[in-house]
């Protein structure tokens, strides 16, 4: 790592960038900052590998973004083993009819348990980012020259910049002067993994739109 540390007293060095959350957004941020001459740390409340409720679809722009960061990392992302390549999305509308969208860009489905851990391992092995797991953010204290990040285990760190990549229940967001989210912009997801599902089109993600749940939908992603 880069030699920064999270400790319990106030003598800790000021880290240039602390990313709260080590999912795809946080990991991509750390990868993008590699080589910028900054000290970087990621703090995540979980220990990797860890799961997230998601449809597990990894769309085309993901790979283009990684290519911009590093062609080598983009290649490794395409060659990732835990995947099901997808070429088509089929959408079923409320009257039962459907239409298909055939994608030119490369994409696949991958369980978040595996995908997120792959990205975190890229950060771990290819950058000097310090990774602190099992670190749940409690609060931020904004001082003149730094932000003090306080964690639930009573440890803390100082940062010149804090990036909130801590998801739907973001702690960082509470300290950003934006309008708070309302029920209008809130949604929930329920996911299960099923085996031996029959009558699936090859390399196809299926979306089912029902009148009572618009703009929500049901999905079957192989």
Residue ranges and their predicted role:
Residues 125-222:
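Predominantly flavin-linked oxidoreductase catalytic cores and closely associated redox partners
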């Amino acid at each position: 790592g880069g030699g920064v540390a999270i400790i319990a007293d106030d003598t800790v060095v000021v880290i240039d960038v602390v990313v709260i959350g080590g999912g795809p957004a946080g990991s991509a941020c750390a990868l993008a900052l590699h080589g910028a001459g900054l000290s970087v740390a990621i703090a995540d409340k979980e220990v990797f590998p860890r799961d997230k409720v998601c449809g597990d679809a990894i769309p085309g722009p993901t790979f283009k973004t990684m290519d911009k960061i590093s062609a080598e990392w983009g290649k490794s992302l395409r060659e990732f083993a835990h995947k099901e390549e997808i070429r088509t999305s089929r959408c079923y509308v409320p009257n039962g009819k459907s239409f298909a969208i055939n994608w030119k860009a490369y994409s696949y489905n991958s369980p978040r348990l595996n995908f997120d851990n792959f990205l975190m391992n890229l950060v771990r092995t290819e950058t000097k980012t310090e990774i602190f797991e099992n670190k749940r953010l409690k609060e931020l204290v904004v001082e003149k020259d730094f932000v003090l990040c306080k964690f639930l285990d009573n440890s803390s760190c100082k940062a010149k910049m804090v990036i909130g990549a801590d998801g739907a229940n973001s702690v960082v967001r509470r300290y950003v002067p934006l309008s708070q989210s309302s029920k209008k912009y809130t949604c929930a997801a329920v996911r299960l993994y099923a085996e031996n599902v029959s009558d699936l089109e090859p390399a196809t993600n299926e979306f089912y739109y029902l009148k009572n749940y618009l703009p929500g939908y049901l999905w079957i992603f192989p």
